[in-house]
Swiss-Prot record:
One of its GO terms (cellular component) is egg chorion. The lineage of its organism: Eukaryota, Metazoa, Ecdysozoa, Arthropoda, Hexapoda. GO terms for molecular function: structural constituent of vitelline membrane. It is found in: Secreted. This is Vitelline membrane protein Vm32E. Disulfide bonds: none annotated. Keywords: Secreted, Signal. Its main location: secreted. It comes from Drosophila yakuba (Fruit fly).
Amino acid sequence: MKIVAFTLVAFVALAGASCPYAAPAAAPAPAAPSGYPAPPCPTNYLFSCQPNLAPAPCAQEAPAYGSAGAYTEQVPQYVGNPSREQVQQFHQRIGMAALMEELRGLGQGIQGQQY
């Protein structure tokens, strides 16, 4: 194992010594400045469908919440937790709808039969 490792190291050293050293190429200069400059910190812009920009004031920070107080919108609550009675009524409605669909299918099957 030592002989294989020594041979490999010698081969790499020989290959490295035989290649002339070339300095790395310099990075190309950018043709144009990249990106857009950021707007000043206290100014926010609201974007609309029109191409114009309108400045919008920032909300004041709430002292108790830090920067989280700047967000004044409430999180919408679409559906509350249903009560046990509401869950039972829902399951009854689903069961009745499935039963009616099954009976409708059976009725159509009987009517389609030829005697």
